[in-house]
Amino acid sequence: MASIKKLMIRGVRSFSHKESNTLEFYSPLTLIVGANGTGKTTIIESLKYATTGSLPPNSRGGAFIHDPSVAGLAEVQGQVKLLFTNVHGETMICSRTIQLAQRRDRREQKTLESVIWAERDGEGVSGRSGDVDAEMPQHFGVSGSILESIIFCHQEESTWPLGEPVVVKKKLDDIFASAKYGKALDSLKSSRKECSSDVKMKMQELEFLRKMKERKESLELRIRSGCMSIEKNEIRVEACDNEIGRCERVIEEIDLELKGNEEAEKRAHLLRGEHRELMEFIDGFREKKLPLEDATDIMSGKSLQEAEEEYERMKMDAEESEMRFKDLSEERSRYIRSKAELDGVFSEISVKSSFLDEARRQKMEALKSLESELKVKKDFRETALEVFGKVEDDIKQRKECIHRLEEEALRLKKEDRDRTVALSEKKRIVDEYSGLESDGSIDVSVSYEDEVGRLRAEISRDREMEALEERLGDYQRRLNDAYSIAERNFAMNQMRGRKREIEGMLNGVNVSELKSKLERQKAKLREKESRAKEIEREMSLRKARAIERSKENDRIRRELRTKSMELGSMGQRSRMAIFEELGIPMLRNGSRCSVERAKEVVRSNEGFFARDDMGFGVEMLDLESLYDGEEVLQRSGASDGIWRERIYREMLEDGCRSHECPVCNKPLSKEEEVEFKRKLEAGIERALDGKENALGSWNDRERIAGEIEALNKEIAGRNKIREEMAELILRYEEVEDVSGEEALDEMELDMLDEAEGIKKTEFLIGLVEELFLIDGKLRGSEEGESVQELRSMVDGIRKIYEEKKEEVRRKKERIEYLCRKQEVIRAEREIREKINFREEAKEAMQRIERSSARIRASDVEEEIRRKKSKLDRILERFARKRVELEMSMEAFYQKEREEACLAKEIEELNSKVRKLLQAEFLDEAKDEVKFDDARSDLLERKNKVLEIGQKIRRMYEMRSLAEESMKYYNRERRVREIERELSETDFEYLAALKEKRRLLEEKKAKLSSQKSLLLGECKQIALGVKSYKQELLKDHGRTVENYNKCFIEVKALELSCMDLDKCIQALDKAIVDFHTSKLEEVNATLKDLWTNTYRGDDVDWIKIKTESSGQRTYNYKVVFVKGGVELDMRGRSSAGQKMIASILIRLALADSFASSCSVLALDEPTTNLDRDNIESLAFTLSRVISRHRRDADFQLIVITHDEDFVQLLSRGGPEYFYRLSRSESGDSMIVRHSIYGTREMGPNKVY
């Protein structure tokens, strides 16, 4: 059993690179204690690195090696040596050396040496790191995963049993060695796969040889049938020639008779086409035609010309009125714009005045606050220390005051900018209101910039909105008339434009004709939809009949397959009898004869297998090949008896001559030779008896062959009928499907055209209705202004104003919220600064108190002078700041005087604007009356023009209808003339002659095609017979012999595959049993450890549970049991429970899987444990130690910082324990101590 003896560490983490530290491990317990950061975990990392070669977690970049910057060197070498005893009792040493070099911009880490050697006779084995890594687990008798995850588990990974499911699965799979057993199983499967692939290849070869054998038989049959077919086709070609000559003579006679009637037929064809076109027009216009008298009167009338002249005259008058109205509108627009400009100036002046008042008030408040701040002065008549403290406080207050004043000054500047922006914004709003007549809408959108900047700009506009609210009533009364007139003019212009657009679209469109056409198209659409449904029903019926026919064909195929299988089974029985007599069952029942032995059997019976006429049963329903000459005797039971007799006699002669078994070449003793002769002679007698009994079986075969022949006839008849039916059905379905598809496509196109026409007609009708509605609106708007419409417009402006006001209110609330939040943040920052200042003051006082005893009187005086000079500088800066503030106040007073002058100018401008507005209001009423008269006159003239236009349109429609009616009557007369001319000509006799000629032509073409097919068939058959004969001579010389050899090889490979399958199943079952038994063993140990360790009553015990997610694939999880209920421990356990569970699971796994290496290292096992659980854990470990006390190789390594835990474990443990500490240079040291409290002294105190 393997064990570890000593460990030497140098240049690893905190251990010095100059001197080595040695640690000796005891049995059964080695205790290592030390404070945090002294290098306890480094011991576990070194053991793990020495045994597995893997570095600890998070050690990239050379963190595992002593830092070169700390050592003051460019390169540092770390070395770990381990003295241990392997599983064979040999003393071994493993040494690993690693180097870390500090370059200019990076660090380089590389392994210098990894060596393992034995101390016996100086023998050593050294090699690369990978060789040592693979060899160390073999010396310890466990796998590398057990060393990493159980024996020397790192502290950061100590709770892996309760970690991520993926990590738990990987580690437990490595511990159970699932991959190793899986590789063995995969190797067997790979062998089985290769064997199966060989079987498939041989089966393909066998299938190819079988087809070659069948090909040979088929070629012989085709040669015979080809010769007979050629003779039959020659007779049929001669009959076709005679019939073709007779048809040509009759066609010549018909052509002579048809040549005299060719002109009359052409004339009749032209008349029929003309008749069809005329009838289409007559049928389409029959319902809309006018009586002949009415149409004649309409065509000769002159009222249309007079109406057109009146329409042109009225249209010119309307255009002149419209030009006069446009001139008045332009003059009125210029007046409204000038009035709006005056209103804008007045509003701007009033708003600016209000802003100046507000700014003046805010400045007065700011000045008062500044004066109150500047008056804060105190006399400084205290001692130097008191003066210093007060000046510091006063300076802080002055800084805050200066900061507030700067903010106030910035705010005032911003207010000036805001007033300028507000005035420009008001001017823009007034300009927009003045442009209502041309635009017809008001743009009330507001753009915002940044979050707080935009909101503060909105608050400035809020003052503007308050001013607007006071003057909104007067402003609206002045703008109501202009706004309502502009709005109505804009709407009327839109309606007129829409009217002109609709009139253009409806020009030449007859509404009544469109409606009638729409009804006809809908009727056609419904008719075509019904026709499409009928076609779909017909197609579904055809599909049902096709399904019934396919079912009947399937039934016939099943009957044919049944009879074929019955005949094939008889041939199979005859084959099996031959193979049993040849000794092939020895290959199947035992493994003594291999594939090579089977080949030798074939070679020894080469004369038997080389026969071309050798057969293993009938596989084709070809009765001619079964009853033709010698083949009947060869395929009968009598020929089987002859073959068996011949084989038995040859085997008997070979065996007596060579005294060996002719099948497996085994030497025969005298007793075996006598028994061999007896069996072969008995076989010869059975073969002779079989010749007589074969005649009876042949009679049975004749009966079955008769049934097969009858069934073949029935099948041939049915196939012929089925082929004819299929040909007719395919032809019929092709024609019907083509016609049906064409009809459906045509109907779909017609339906789309009709639907498009319907949509277009409905759109035109909607346009006409919209035109009537617009006319009504225009007439209603021209009768007078509506008070309700004006009121709605005012309400719209008020609604826009309210929305704007609500939006400003929301922005103001948002600003208030942000300001409050900013104030809270500022208060928190000030509090933190005060706290920091207080802490700094406390620390300064403490430093002063600690150093006061050592400071001389001169130092104190120097400090006082320095403080006084600092105080003077602060007072000087304060005086300069006060002068600057007083100058700022003087500037504010100057600005206030300028604002007073500006207010006086604004008042003068207000008085002038009021006088101008009173003079212009008197002229406005006169212009409105004149404008209304011009507008009513224009509307009246346009209505008259519209009425005359509608009258002319109706007259044009009646005239076009009269023209179409005259065409109708003329074409009706022409139709009667064509019908009379067609009735005088007799076409029945000519049609009969043409039909007869067409049938003769078809018959002639069919006979010619049949003749060509027969000649081509004869030629192809002759070529085929020739090629068949050449193929028989060239490719089928040894076909049957090769088939028999391949058949034996396939059987031998199949037996090998069966043996591999049994081996795979046995190994698979063994893997599952091993996994189950080991897991039960681990859980039993884990239950015992938990019940004796854990002191809580919330968990009865824990166990590792597996869930199979596939074949040999397991998912693991740790569950705890409470009252018979299992719960997943991950996510439901405390940190202490995780630590106890992880330690106990490692103990249980080590007990089951590390029997060859009874070493276990526990790093800080008391982490997160309370006192009771620490004591119970110590008790459990003591029990484990006492249980393995007789085992000299059991070693438990415990690393902890808990002195009480060390005392609990040392009660029955070793006499010594190790304590880790730091030297004055910061390097870790290992010192051995006695459990009785004395430190071991001597030359080897540091190991």
Swiss-Prot record:
InterPro entries for this protein: P-loop_NTPase (IPR027417), Rad50/SbcC_AAA (IPR038729)
Cofactor: Zn(2+)
EC number: 3.6.-.-
Entry's Gene Ontology cellular component terms: condensed nuclear chromosome; Mre11 complex
Binding site for ATP: 13, 36-37, 39-42, 63, 65, 67, 155
Protein family: Belongs to the SMC family. RAD50 subfamily.
Pfam annotation, one family: AAA_23
Function statement: Component of the MRN complex, which plays a central role in double-strand break (DSB) repair, DNA recombination, maintenance of telomere integrity and meiosis. The MRN complex is involved in the repair of DNA double-strand breaks (DSBs) via homologous recombination (HR), an error-free mechanism which primarily occurs during S and G2 phases. The complex (1) mediates the end resection of damaged DNA, which generates proper single-stranded DNA, a key initial steps in HR, and is (2) required for the recruitment of other repair factors and efficient activation of ATM and ATR upon DNA damage.
Keywords: ATP-binding, Chromosome, Coiled coil, DNA damage, DNA repair, Hydrolase, Magnesium, Meiosis, Metal-binding, Nucleotide-binding, Nucleus, Zinc
Quaternary structure and interacting proteins, as annotated: Component of the MRN complex composed of two heterodimers RAD50 and MRE11 associated with a single NBS1.
GO molecular function, one term: metal ion binding
Reactions that this protein is recorded to catalyse: ATP + H2O = ADP + phosphate + H(+)
Residues forming coiled coils: 299-415, 459-545, 787-942, 972-1020
Record note on cofactor: Binds 1 zinc ion per homodimer.
Protein name: DNA repair protein RAD50
Subcellular location: Nucleus; Chromosome
